[in-house]
A protein has these predicted regions:
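Terminal, low-structured helical/coil segments at or just beyond the last alpha-helical repeat
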Residues: 1-7, 95-127
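Alpha-helical segment of the N-proximal tetratricopeptide repeat
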Residues: 5-36
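Start-of-helix register in tetratricopeptide repeats
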Residues: 8, 42, 59, 76, ...
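Structural marker of alpha-solenoid helical repeat scaffolds
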Residues: 36, 70, 103-107
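Canonical tetratricopeptide repeat
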Residues: 46, 80, 114-118
Length: 127
């Protein structure tokens, strides 16, 4: 039988797996979590992050889009989606996300600084 799973428990389990870099286990928990909480932008962001870590770029991209549809100003989703664009050699799109973060964080924020650093590291590699 399929016992009812508490979404909060799934989310906590997933974040614990992510801390330990157990991406496949996190993916399973987040798959169930996003089914039970389809309107949670942070859930979709983490799901996409996990897929990106497993190099499932296409699925990750779809799920970052879902997160940003639900919450267009989700700074973490914008940062992580920007990192996906860097990893898939689309620096122009990463720059668009960086510019959005600059608008959301006029005096700076972690997400802006992290994405800026990520883009700069990639740019240095290609020199």
């Amino acid at each position: 039988y399929d016992k009812k799973v508490d979404p909060t428990e799934l989310y906590e389990k997933a974040t614990s797996h992510l801390k330990n870099e157990e991406y496949r286990k996190a993916l399973r928990a987040l798959g169930k979590y996003t089914k039970s909480k389809p309107k949670d932008a942070d859930g979709w962001t983490l799901y996409a992050f996990t897929q990106r870590k497993l190099k499932n770029y296409k699925k990750a991209e779809v799920n970052y889009e879902k997160a940003l549809e639900l919450d267009p100003e989700n700074k973490i989703a914008l940062e992580y989606q920007g990192e996906l664009f860097v990893e898939t050699e689309r620096l122009g799109l990463a720059q668009v996300n960086l510019n959005k973060l600059k608008e959301l964080c006029p005096t700076s924020c972690d997400e802006l600084e992290q994405l800026r650093k990520y883009i700069n590291q990639e740019a240095e590699k290609s020199l």
